From Swiss-Prot:
Bias (Acidic residues) ranges: 42-58
Protein name: Transcription initiation factor TFIID subunit 11b
CDD domains reported for this sequence: HFD_TAF11
Summary of the function given for this chain in its UniProt record: TAFs are components of the transcription factor IID (TFIID) complex that is essential for mediating regulation of RNA polymerase transcription.
Claim: Nucleus is one of the keywords in the record: yes
Species the sequence originates in: Arabidopsis thaliana (Mouse-ear cress)
Amino acid sequence: MAFNARSCCFASSNERVTCNCNCLKDQPVPRMKHSKDPFEAAMEEQEESPVETEQTLEGDERAVKKCKTSVVAEAKNKDEVEFTKNITGADPVTRANKMQKILSQFTEEQMSRYESFRRSGFKKSDMEKLVQRITGGPKMDDTMNIVVRGIAKMFVGDLVETARVVMRERKESGPIRPCHIRESYRRLKLQGKVPQRSVQRLFR
């Protein structure tokens, strides 16, 4: 209820009143403002503040996770770079210099054999037939064929080089003979460079 001091008019705050003394003139009675209880205001602030705190904590956690992720990514990239360096070794210039030093110590005969070694290689079809006949398995892919041919080429190179060492020890010259190959094979077998049989022979 609202009380008008100029007239003895009582009216509710939601009603429009007129009186005989024309004190209100069909004007709405102003409403009184309700002040908040201090305790209620404090409770409302406490209810709103946890949300802001949670949002702040979530933002901090996201920032920390992002920072950790970036640090881990940088460390991973660094490890990959170091791993690549260990695989490739030195830079191309250093490798070329080392190779040049090794080649400079070759004799004319060794250089000729090295050039022949670089140009030579096993035929792909022949190696494929040989491996398929030995293993009895299906046709091998191109990658395996390249690996097998590379290993066979290295073994033949070691065999020839050791045979030349045998010839120098025996003070012999000329082409390599079967006796030199047999002695070279025996030495390589003693050095563990010849793979051992996994299955024993049935007949000697």
